Structures are given as C-alpha cells and as structure tokens.
Amino acid sequence: MKATIVTVGDEILIGQIIDTNSSFIAKSLDKIGIGVHEMLSITDDKQHILQTLSLLQNKVDVVIITGGLGPTKDDITKKTLCEYFNDKLIINEKVLVHVTQLIEDYFKRPITQVNKDQALVPSKCEVLFNQVGTAPGMWLQKENTVFISLPGVPYEMKYLIENEVIPKLIAKYDRPFIIHKTILTYGVGESLLAERIETWEDNLPKFIKLAYLPSPGRVRLRLSARGVDENVLKNEISLQVQKLQLIISDCIVGFEEDETLEVVLGKLLTEKKLTISTAESCTGGKIASTITSVSGSSNYFKGSIVSYATEAKVAVLGISQEKINKFSVVSTQVAEEMATQVQKKFKTNFAIATTGNAGPNKGDANAEVGTVFIAIATPKGVFSEKFNFGQPREKVIDRALNQALEMIYKEILKNYSK
C-alpha cells in the first residue's frame, strides 16, 4: 500500500512555518504498514490543488491532505474538493452544534456566520469529527484512491489521525506487517561504522532493509522488516541485532526508536543512584538543557553553572586567575578545575565541564576556532580531552554536547556500573 501526504499553504512554501504534520502522519501510517510514497507541499491555489489531486488519483491508495480548512478566504481546500468531486457544500448539524458550543463556552460570544461556515462539508464526504477544534476532517473516495482532508493545526490533525483516520484505515485495508528496530550508536562516524558492519549488512535477508541515520556525534541504524508473518519478522530482527552487537558492542548505547543518549544516560544514573552537575562555557548551558529535557532528571541532575565570561569563571566557579593567565581560559587545566569546582559546589558524584572557542573569531584566548576541552570529574579524580570540531559555530556546540554526553556515559558504564 502506498500513500501521499499533501500539505496546503503558502506559509510553508515561503519558510514561515515548518511542516511537522507530514512527519507525524508518516510515522502513524508506517506503524500500520502503509508506506508513504511521497510528500508534497503546494500553494493555496485552486488549480494547483486540483492538478495535484488529479495526478494522485489511482497512483496511490491513500492521499492525506492537511491545511486550508480554516474560516478565512484563503482557506479553499473544501471548495476545491467539492469542485474535484463534482459536489456541493452542506451544513453538518453535528459539527454546527459542536462549533456553536465551543465558541460560546470558550470565547463567551455568539457564533458568527464565519464560524457557522466551519460546519460546511462536501455532501459526499464522511465527516471525521474533530473533538478538539472547529474544522472537521473529511473522508472521500474516487475510484481506487481515498482522499482524507484534515485541518493544518498540528494538535487537531494529531487528534484526527489517532482517533479517526488510523482506525478507519485499519478496518478498510489488509496491510503487511512492518517491524522497525533502531540501534543507537555513539563515537563512530557513519563511514567507519559502515566499514565495520559491511559483511553483516551484505548478509541481511532480502526482506530486511538497513538505513543509516547520522547526526553530530551519533549514528542510528534502523532495521526495517516487511512481510505477512509478524513472528518471523520479529525473530529475524532479534537475531540480526544479536549478530550486530557482537561486531560493534563498544559503540551501541540503546535500542529504542526514540531513545537518545540523554535518556540512556538518565536511566543509568537513576539505576546506579548517581548524581551529576555541569559547568559550561562554550556550550552555553546546552548540556544542562539536554540532560534536563528528560522527565525525572531532577533525581540525578543537581545543577549547572554557565560561566561564559572569564570573570564568571573566577568569581562564580573559583578558577584561579593565575591558572588562566598561565594556561589560557581554553585549556585542559581550566576545564578540569571547572569540573572539579562544580562537582564540589553541587556535591555530585560526577560533573561535566566545557571550555572552548565555538567561533567564528579566535577570541581573547586566541584558541583556534572549533577547539573545545571537555573535562569529567568523577569520584576518583578528573580527566579531560581536547577536540577540534571545526566550523560553523552551531556544529561546534552540538558536537561538544554529544561528545560530553558520550564521555560521561562511557566513564560510568566502564568504571562505575558494577
């Protein structure tokens, strides 16, 4: 089965907003065995919409359209669907009652004609009732293709996908099983990783596909199996993961689709009842922000000091001015003292510290752009490493973040997890 996702709206095409709807819809369809053939973003133009619908008819099984269902004049999706299906708009009484109640309860005013028009739907459509908004979804079919129109507001779209669209698609179609397993790796680049697992990859069964999903400091390996026997797929995926672990056990840190290193680190710290703090310069608090993005992180993360300026390192962290003058603020010595001092201040088992030059200029320390020192304070002492993450500034910060998390994770796993 194949599907196409169409987002309607000039605001997407001019870069004013980011299309997050397509990603959510694609993931939802993939979970029930419907593959997305393509994603399209088109203008708020009637002819463009009509042309797109015509091109997709009988090309794919399902077309999901988001956007253009609002109350303003530039929201033309409903009228255009009527033209394409040779239909007319009628009032849906259930939707009208819902819209009226919503306006009166939440906005404390009478309903206007513009609001009433939200209850207009093509007479041939099956209405997908939108409990969390005013614009209903619509389900239409022409020959072999189902067309589903949804509001562009993300939380309304998500509600309709989860509560209306997915259940109806499951009931309508026989679909293959699709099993995914994602392996999270750190510390090895994509090309080197590919070399290490080349033989294993070449011997994968034909019904299992491997995808490399790289990002700064990490590579996710996604195994996808498609077939009619779910148990066979699960067993084969499990077998292949076991084989992979024997090859790259040194850089695997997790196995879940949405699991990140900060989540894995949090689980490890929680399990071992350990605590952590950070002292950040060039990363500007990003390490602390990432660690605390995980629910329950207050159990192991005690605090952070962002000592960006040299005077803050001296006044707040207590780094000696003599040491800075002798070795430079971007140095092993300063990084290690930052980690040691913040560990003491927050009384934590571990601490991370960063100091460096993210660019674009050399700065007062005269360090090369991209130079970062990362220090880890442990119950047994402190150590640090020097890196050069190149340019641009955003890349330096992201790579320093990932490297710091990897260093602390591996240190705890290696020396403190028994």
UniProtKB/Swiss-Prot annotation:
Pfam families to which the protein is assigned, alphabetical: CinA, CinA_KH, MoCF_biosynth
Similarity annotation: Belongs to the CinA family.
Cross-referenced PANTHER family: NICOTINAMIDE-NUCLEOTIDE AMIDOHYDROLASE PNCC, NMN AMIDOHYDROLASE-LIKE PROTEIN YFAY
NCBIfam families from the UniProt entry: cinA_nterm, molyb_syn, PncC_domain, PRK00549.1
Protein name: CinA-like protein
Native organism: Flavobacterium psychrophilum (strain ATCC 49511 / DSM 21280 / CIP 103535 / JIP02/86)
Lineage: Bacteria, Pseudomonadati, Bacteroidota, Flavobacteriia, Flavobacteriales
